[in-house]
Amino acid sequence: MSKVIPINPTHDFKERSRQVLNDPGQRKNFRGAMDFLQAKRRAQFVDQEELQGLRELGSQIRRYSLANLPRLLELLETRLTANGVQVHWAQSPDEANAIALGIAQRVDAKRIIKGKSMVSEEIGFNHAMEAAGIEAFESDMGEYIVQLAGEAPSHIIMPAIHKTKQEIARLFADEVPGVSYTEDVDALIAIGRKVLRRKFADADIGLSGVNFCVAETGTLCLVENEGNGRMCTTVPKVHIAITGIEKVLEKLEHVPPLVSLLTRSATGQSVTTYVNMISGPRKPGEKDGPQEVHLILLDNGRTQAYADEELRATLQCIRCGACMNHCPVYARIGGHAYGTTYPGP
């Protein structure tokens, strides 16, 4: 049976909610951001029949995947192994971190560059690596901002959505050497890009999440907008991907409908800037790509949810974040009030 990370018993939801509700500026920021994201999603789904049809198709695919989960996970491991990917199974956060740490120590890694991964937040990956003397550096711009601030993400898609432009400007001026205060958004992005490019060049390992695993072909699908995911998975000599066991699909043809739902619902885009399909490490004769690819499949209570007929439906989630964007409670108090990795009522 999995060891499940408990909700932080010292976290006071009522007190944290009260603090946010007593801050008019923060309430205004949350409300404005949620209104903006809702409008972008509506613009993508003008035709309600199309929306309902796509949602039903996506639901059918996810229900089918979960109904066949044990078989698909076995097939995924077989195909990935044949492709040269090393597959690891982790029952708990401690086990997942131990696997990653073992890989890092074997290759004498000192620096890990990270793409966006909520599962890495779920297991406390950064703290585990830092405790072992290994730097874990976020490369997603939002994650980089909250890491600089010493905070957790407040939204599963937009980690720093609770930060104002002025707060980010002050954070960069205080925490990034040689940077002066500026509220120019393009300048702030350029500063972040310059720092991150150096980190990519110095990294020994790249860590990423996975949006979907395709069992039939042994493929890891990763969607993103900044290009940092592609850099994390191709520049370092070792790539470690980590995801929950529920993310498996049977066929490649199941990916496009779910990616369409994900991107249009999450950020109001027809498709993300980058769609990465990873099916193994660098082959002989190839000039780029990692020499090793590892996949850590995390349980952490998912098999318990799978065994419960009612809870099993929660495993269909594709992590688009639209429920948070439309939640009247979240829009008023944000994600930090909950004290959990995946916030919301």
Identify the function of each model-found stretch.
Residues 193, 198-281, 286:
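Conserved phosphate- and dinucleotide-binding cores of soluble alpha/beta proteins
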